Amino acid sequence: MPTPAATEIKPAPLPPVDRVKVRVNGREVEVPKTMPDPLTGKPLPTTMIQACAAAQVDVPHYCYHPKLPVAGNCRMCLVEFGTPAVGPDRKPILNPDGSSKIARSPRPAIACATPVSPGMEIYTETAAVKKMREGVLEFLLINHPLDCPICDQAGECKLQEYSVEYGQSASRFVEPKVHKPKRVDLGPRIVLDDERCILCTRCIRFTRDIVGEDALGIVNRGSYNTLAAYPGKLFANNYTLNTVDICPVGALTSKDFRFQMRVWFLKETKSLCTSCATGCNIVIGSREGKIYRFEPRENDAVNVCWMCDYGRLNYKWIGSQDRLRKVQSPKSEVQSQPEGWSLVIGEVSERLKQAAGGSAAVIGSARQSNEELYLLAKLAKTLGAVTDSVPRMAEGDRLLLNADRNPNSTGARLTGIAAEPIGSNLPKIAEGIRTGRIKTLLVVGEDVTRHGLGPDLLGKLETLIVSDILPSETTRLAHYLLPGCAHAEKRGTFCNAKGRVQKFMKAVEPPGDARPEWEFLRELVSKLSMKDGFATIEGLFNQMAAEVPGFDGLTWAGLGETGVTVNI
């Protein structure tokens, strides 16, 4: 009996979204009547500041943050507004031309907390609004220190920018400033300067509402208000450095980045965090080949605009002096020859050809890119080799840190390099080496001596080919050593735990003779299959998407800056 054709299930249509028309400085813009709450997702009335953003009108603000609950305490976003006038009979009053007459409100409103209504007109550039901004800035600067020459926030400071754009040219305040604590050690990663703090409460709301920890608060009163941690409690959760990102004035500074580099010297590169399977979007700040910081990059589908401290600080190994820099082979003279790579690739390809037919194994790291794992899988298929990857599990949390510390476990499964579950083939590989069935082992990005393949087993191999970034016991035992690159030194893609395929870009050059692994793996695949592969990462990704079902339909260009989710 023939099987009936599957009925296509179409998603239910989304309910219509009510929209309202408002005018911002005379320009009409249509916005949704409600927008989702950044914490709960429940609909909240669209506010003036959101309508202004839709009209591409910048409204200065300090306390407002689009991903935090509204506080409405800085008053910097004050605007004037009007609504359609109505008569005693509650009918609209019309102008002679038939348009609605606008009744201007006698009082300004804070744009961050005032909902829009149909027909509302918002004015952000009137003389009164400019005067209000001057007044707010004057109050904020009364006790603010002139720390700009030594402040880490200089160059990306909203107080600095708004003072130039909206403030007065001179201060009228002649009385002594109120002095507050400076260089307050809040915890293992944060230094607080209370004199710079403008009490916007962004950091308090972040720790309370995003992290779920009441760690910070405002103490004292009036001009003597200060930010402080709770008595006897360190500010030490795994997300503290996000408060440095959202602090608009440099009151909270990172001990890691403090006094290291002026931000206007940094080159910014869009990349991904590789410390776990979440795949947080980041910006790498570098100068002259040195990485100075990781910062979160906004992607609502992955990390919103946050990242954990563990991932943020996990970058110094990239610039380690211990990095592997030279290709090595049993012929020691190769190390000093300029053509070392081509010679070693030739030798390695010959060794692999001899191992074809089941006497080889391939272990690829789930910290490698999708493209590299795809090439490893092709190489293993050509050799008839057993493959696997190394699991890397630790404690996660409810926010961003995933228990899987490999950034590309999903990619390792989709490309076929990893067993299911990951690591289940490692005992088989160890047994194959022990019995002499496996004579050649190719390891990329892992120290397998920590995962059941000790030096005694590796010593039984006829050929051990290793590619890695830092020295290990496995690299020490290698017959052929191929220095690879960190993710910040190459381009490629990862697939996170939820199946989102995302790009990372090259920020700095690799040291010495190190090369992106996909380059020499492509050469090995070409030599063994006698077919030339793509010479660019774009072409390689598109080839992978055409051959691997899990990436079907994707293109490098189509990934954009925030990625595409696939079924896993």
How should these model regions be labeled?
Residues 36-50, 369, 516:
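Short, structural beta-strand-to-alpha-helix junction motif
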Residues 15-30:
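Eukaryote-biased recognition of intrinsically disordered, low-complexity regulatory segments
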Residues 48-82:
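A basic, amphipathic helix-loop patch mediating RNA/tRNA/ribosome contacts
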Residues 32-45, 112-118, 128, 296-301:
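A short, sequence-level motif marking secondary-structure junctions
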Residues 2, 14-18, 55-59:
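Cysteine-rich modules of extracellular adhesion/ECM and protease-associated proteins
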Residues 2-13, 75-274, 278-282, 287-290:
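Fe-S ferredoxin-like electron-transfer domains
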Residues 145, 193, 200, 205, ...:
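Catalytic alpha/large subunits of respiratory electron-transfer oxidoreductases
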